[in-house]
UniProtKB/Swiss-Prot annotation:
The gene is panC. It comes from Clostridium novyi (strain NT). NCBIfam families: cyt_tran_rel, panC. The reaction proceeds by a bi uni uni bi ping pong mechanism. This is Pantothenate synthetase. Belongs to the pantothenate synthetase family. InterPro entries: Cyt_trans-like, Pantoate_ligase, Pantoate_ligase_C, Rossmann-like_a/b/a_fold. The active site is at 37 (proton donor). The lineage of its organism: Bacteria, Bacillati, Bacillota, Clostridia, Eubacteriales. Pfam families: Pantoate_ligase. Its EC number is 6.3.2.1. It catalyses: (R)-pantoate + beta-alanine + ATP = (R)-pantothenate + AMP + diphosphate + H(+).
């Protein structure tokens, strides 16, 4: 396995692989890899001849009051995990390598980024789409792998790929959870022992909402109210949003007549956590 930090170095290997007719899987990450990331990497290794894992804490997707400087980094552990998983290249560039000092070109997906996380994190998805576009160009990936936990990101990337005719297949992978139900996240490292226990209100709230949906309730307001009541049982929890939206367009719905995404964001102490599930009508 190779650990590279220069774009041209990655391109050199990609060109060789393409000449040989090999398929390439890309797993874009911000590092601090956990079992959720590993599930993406394992699938990429299984489905492609070569796999590139990018480890890059992307400054352009963090707002001015967000946790860029504090975001957990563990490159040695990340490289070890990737090596054991059968990854071909770990791409770990510096921000100066990814962005020219006078860069003025960005990729922005409209409408889908207006709600959910996009409503509170101005510029976040512009940063995500720009860096992912660059990674697509650098890697020339056959397939790229994203987790369902970042459901809005997955929907936005799919739309960007469609609209801009990127020649890459987007593969969405299921949420990986701890044994007690908490969705795996790099930000879980921020949680104190007490906060870690309180964080379970996210998965419990979603489970309550899911029970109503599978029990035949179709009124969005009832679903949201039930989830809200469960989350409010935590004295450390502060709700950012609870939304029920169309699973494709991400537009809010009042009565559930098609597949929907039920998504929540909650602050546990100072740590913002997200979780979600997709309800498919007819299942």
């Amino acid at each position: 396995m190779l650990k590279l930090n220069k774009i041209n170095e990655v391109k050199k290997y990609v060109d060789e692989w393409k000449k040989e007719g090999l398929t390439i899987g890309l797993v874009p990450t911000m590092g601090c890899l956990h079992e959720g990331h590993k599930s993406l990497i394992d699938r990429a290794v299984k489905e492609n001849d070569k796999v590139i894992v990018s480890v890059f804490v992307n400054p352009t997707q963090f707002g001015p009051n967000e946790d860029f400087d504090k975001y957990p980094r563990s490159i040695e552990n990340d490289v070890d995990l990737c090596n054991k998983a059968g990854v071909s290249i770990v791409f770990n560039p510096d921000p100066k390598e990814m962005y020219f000092h006078d860069a003025c070109t960005y990729v922005n997906v409209e409408n889908l980024t207006d709600g959910l996380c996009g409503a509170k994190r101005e510029g976040h998805f512009r940063g995500v789409c720009t860096v992912v576009s660059k990674l697509f160009n650098i890697s020339q990936a056959t397939r790229a792998y994203f987790g369902q936990k970042d459901a809005q990101q997955l929907a936005v990337i799919k739309r960007m790929v469609r609209d801009l005719n990127f020649n890459v297949e987007i593969v969405g992978c299921p949420i990986v959870r701890e044994s007690d139900g908490l969705a795996k996240s790099s930000r879980n490292k921020y949680l104190s022992k007490e906060e870690r226990v309180e964080a379970l209100v996210l998965s419990r709230g979603l489970r309550k909402g899911k029970e109503l949906l599978y029990g035949g309730i179709r009124k969005t307001s009832k679903i949201k109210e039930t989830i809200e009541n469960e989350i409010k049982k935590s004295h450390l929890g502060k709700i950012d949003y609870i939304e029920v939206v169309d699973s494709i367009t991400l537009e809010p719905v009042e009565n559930i007549e098609r597949d929907v995404l039920v998504a929540i964001a909650v602050f546990i102490g100072k740590t913002r956590l997200i979780d979600n599930f997709i309800f498919k009508l007819g299942e």
